[in-house]
Curated annotation (Swiss-Prot):
Catalytic activity: 7-aminomethyl-7-carbaguanosine(34) in tRNA + S-adenosyl-L-methionine = epoxyqueuosine(34) in tRNA + adenine + L-methionine + 2 H(+)
Family: Belongs to the QueA family.
Broad class of the protein's primary localization: cytoplasm
Entry's Gene Ontology molecular function annotations: S-adenosylmethionine:tRNA ribosyltransferase-isomerase activity
Stored Pfam families: Queuosine_synth (PF02547)
Protein name: S-adenosylmethionine:tRNA ribosyltransferase-isomerase
Length: 347
């Protein structure tokens, strides 16, 4: 298939620049690939789409304030870092600007010396391995000096950094939020649990590659970035029990889907405690082994995320749903509205 097969018209004014005042006040488009019905509702009614025997699976990763602004210690030239992943100890892979000035041995100071980075290795495309030195606890220093790494299509300043975290964010490590989870409130989760739905958490640390456009014409030639995931034995046991009892596995967001399907593919559709790196690329033709339904935001044209939704619900129907969302003035991308998709019965 061609990348252009997943293109659609999107007016720029529909790209949400700020979160809504109330998380669950966002709109929700419910689509059924079997009946091809579309229903416009609001996110706090997602509970109506969930059955008492279901499990709702959420990604509890926490976004690091991973954007740092500092200066070279010798020339005082301005430097920007975006932390990508912790390689070991105090060593991190970062995206540096301007990278050409940062050779091995270069030192960068942040917060008037509260945090210092030494370049230990040069990578391609502006990447660097750096070793940080600091007093105290690294994450506390980062919280005080770093800024949230908002997506490139958001130009407004984020007034409250907690709005780019889910209410259940726990495990530090992401360069971007698992945005499908931003709509949930503690009260809504309590109501869902009270209905008899199991709340299950996994972790996938979202990498910067989530914003990387597909640069090839043939989607089969696209290579996904790798992201680290973890599923506990307790979570795996709960999900297997739900499946056995006839309940559905309902994933919140594409990161939860990719984690569950990665593990399901390893263990013949069953789930076990597992952790590792995944670069699974879910596109039309993929056969789902674990996930029965999911919620997700509205994604970029020609993105791998639109391809994933199309693999689940069919490309033509997904593009119809996106056209409907544009006509109904749904808000798109990270701070935008959501979609709920049920599993086609024939799969």
């Amino acid at each position: 298939m061609n990348t252009n097969d997943f293109d659609f018209e999107l007016p720029e004014e529909l790209i949400a620049q700020t979160p809504l005042k109330q998380r669950d006040a966002s709109k929700l488009l419910v689509i059924d690939p079997v009946t091809r019905e579309m229903t416009d509702t609001h996110f706090d009614h997602i509970i109506d789409q969930l059955n008492p025997r279901d499990a709702l699976v959420m990604n509890n990763t926490r976004v690091l304030p991973a954007r740092l602004y500092g200066e070279k210690t010798d020339t005082h030239g301005h430097v920007e870092f975006l932390l990508l992943k912790n390689t070991q100890g105090d060593q991190w892979e970062v995206l540096a600007k301007p990278a050409k000035r940062l050779k091995v041995g270069a030192k960068v100071s942040f917060g008037y010396g509260r945090l210092t980075a030494t370049v230990t290795e040069e990578l391609d495309h502006g990447g660097r391995i750096v070793e940080f030195s600091y007093d105290g606890i690294f994450l506390e220093v980062l919280e005080s000096l770093g800024e949230m790494p908002l997506p490139p299509y958001i130009h407004e300043k984020l007034e409250d950094r907690d709005r780019y975290q889910t209410v259940y964010a726990k495990e530090n490590g992401s360069a971007a939020a698992p945005t499908a989870g931003l709509h949930f409130t503690p009260e809504l989760l309590q109501k869902i649990e009270a209905k008899g739905v199991k709340l299950v958490y996994l972790t996938l640390h979202v990498g910067l590659g989530t914003f990387r456009p597909v640069s090839v014409d043939n989607i089969d030639e696209h290579e996904m970035h790798s992201e680290f995931y973890t599923l506990s034995q307790e979570a795996a046991d709960t999900l297997n029990s739900v499946k056995t009892a006839g309940g559905r596995i309902v994933a919140v967001g594409t990161t939860s889907i990719r984690t569950l399907e990665t593990i399901g593919n390893k263990y013949d559709g069953q789930l076990q405690a597992d952790s590792g790196w995944t670069n699974i690329f879910i596109k039309p033709g993929y056969q789902f082994t674990v996930v029965d339904a999911f919620s997700t935001n509205f994604h970029l044209p020609k993105s791998t995320l639109v391809m994933l939704v199309s693999a689940f619900a069919g490309r033509e129907f997904v593009l119809e749903a996106y056209k409907h969302a544009v006509q109904e003035r749904y808000r798109f991308f990270s701070f935008g509205d959501a979609m709920f998709v049920t599993r086609p019965s024939e799969k």
